[in-house]
Design a protein with these regions (language model features):
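Accessory terminal regions of nucleic-acid processing enzymes
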Residues: 1-137
């Protein structure tokens, strides 16, 4: 049982994560932070509670923790069925190794590949041809 006083936050937060030719940022709007500086993220489920942290939610929560320099989060999943509301809380702690190896490494790879793509006219034309169906290949 939790007796959190959750402070709703309306601010869009962002933080630079990589710089090459351009500066790359991650950002987002969080649901709230409790009085103990624990990030609160609420997910309203459509069919059922998952009782585990989904990969895409982990990336989202880790990004928020990184941006805000927080260590802990709670994912609150809610499933409403008729007049009942089932709630499950999943505790999430920031893991620097996971952040570096599973998230940031992919952000850096994407950013560098995108910058290379944008500087390569032939690659841009090739993609346009594919998307427009004008590529004979």
């Amino acid at each position: 049982e939790y007796n959190d006083n959750v402070n709703k936050v309306e601010t869009f937060f962002k933080k630079p994560v990589y710089k090459n030719k351009y500066e790359w940022y991650i950002g987002g709007k969080i649901d709230g932070i409790n009085d103990d500086n624990v990030l609160i993220e609420v997910k309203n489920r459509m069919n059922r509670l998952f009782y585990r942290l989904r990969d895409y939610e982990k990336v989202q929560i880790f990004s928020y923790l990184y941006i805000l320099e927080l260590e802990n989060a709670r994912l609150v999943e809610c499933y409403k069925k008729q007049n009942n509301c089932n709630i499950n809380v999943i505790e999430v702690g920031f893991d620097q190794d996971y952040w570096d190896n599973e998230i940031m490494s992919k952000v850096v790879l994407f950013a560098s590949m995108f910058e290379n793509f944008m500087e390569n006219r032939d690659k841009r034309v090739e993609l346009a041809d594919i998307l427009l169906g004008t590529n004979p290949a």
